[in-house]
């Protein structure tokens, strides 16, 4: 795992097309903004896990 330190307003790049910007810090919460192409899915981890669980469930008709 790569660990980076960023201040509010600073950005990191993932590849050529994805940026992650620190928008604010309040207590133990960090607000981030993600800019990515439409074909790149961006989800919070708990939402991603729910999507994956739904995909693995058999479809009943």
From Swiss-Prot:
Protein's cellular compartments: Cytoplasm
One Pfam short name: CsrA
GO CC, alphabetical: cytosol
Highest rank taxon of the organism: Bacteria
GO molecular function: mRNA 5'-UTR binding
Keywords: Activator, Cytoplasm, Repressor, RNA-binding, Translation regulation
Quaternary state and interactors: Homodimer; the beta-strands of each monomer intercalate to form a hydrophobic core, while the alpha-helices form wings that extend away from the core.
UniProt-listed HAMAP family: CsrA (MF_00167)
UniProt protein name: Translational regulator CsrA
Organism: Pectobacterium carotovorum subsp. carotovorum (strain PC1)
Taxonomic lineage from the root: Bacteria, Pseudomonadati, Pseudomonadota, Gammaproteobacteria, Enterobacterales
Gene that encodes it: csrA
């Amino acid at each position: 795992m790569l660990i980076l330190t960023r201040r509010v307003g600073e950005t990191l790049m993932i590849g050529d097309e994805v940026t992650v910007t620190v928008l604010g810090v309040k207590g133990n919460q960090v607000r981030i903004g993600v800019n990515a192409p439409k074909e790149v899915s961006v989800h919070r981890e708990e939402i991603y896990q729910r999507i994956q669980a739904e995909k693995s469930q058999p479809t009943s008709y």
